[in-house]
Amino acid sequence: MSQIMYNYPAMLAHAAEMNTYSGALHAVGADIAAEQHALASAWQGDTGMTYQAWQAQWNQAMEELVRAYRAMATTHEQNTMAMSARDQAEGAKWG
């Protein structure tokens, strides 16, 4: 029977890195939104209305993406901590 080995510090570092990436995604989204906002005043009538609808969809999609990525990072961290605690508890049984 083979053993399954986990590198908990590396797994936690990966979760932290995922949180960093979610922050980067948020920053890129904010930059793009600022650029689009600068252009919005030039779009009027039907074009302006179409732009506003597109921008609302884009903003919502970006928020959902960032929220989902943060949730993945949090879940990864929580599961890693739970696995580590379980390993320690099982190890304590063996003295």
Curated annotation (Swiss-Prot):
Keywords: Secreted. It is found in: Secreted. Forms a tight 1:1 complex with EsxG. The keyword Secreted applies. GO terms for cellular component: extracellular region. The lineage of its organism: Bacteria, Bacillati, Actinomycetota, Actinomycetes, Mycobacteriales. SUPFAM superfamilies: EsxAB dimer-like. Coiled coil: none annotated. This is ESAT-6-like protein EsxH. InterPro entries: ESAT-6-like_sf (IPR036689), T7SS_ESAT-6-like (IPR010310). Belongs to the WXG100 family. ESAT-6 subfamily. It comes from the Bacteria. It comes from Mycolicibacterium smegmatis (strain ATCC 700084 / mc(2)155) (Mycobacterium smegmatis). Transmembrane segments: none annotated.
